[in-house]
């Protein structure tokens, strides 16, 4: 349970997850205005909500559960602002497999936040980017671990960076 097995979990929703990720990337990139910087609220989210890391090939268990708790607590105490939850995978595995795995990670984090009292209406979307946007490019286990993550960010953060 919680482990994604190729072939066993395949269905049309995998294709839908892939298409959704591509559509969101295109829509967000084209909707970018000329932002002058991030709001204080967006900066606070970036400074206080930490990345959540996952074991290899797992979407429903994290390396450090205290990070999920701390993030949820901070978000409850600071209830303003929309959120985007984005899952990622390390570069091993094929594109569709990693998109689905990263999507499930993002959905799991979203569910954990809501379970811990974060208002679900704040979360505009939770999606997976697979092996896109790697934070570490080396091919060792330590680097792979850094890429198996979920980020929680304010929408304007991504729009600001994509507009640069």
Identify the role of each PLM range.
Residues 82-88:
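Glycine- and acidic-rich phosphate- and metal-coordinating loops
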Residues 17-27:
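Bacterial N-terminal signal peptides
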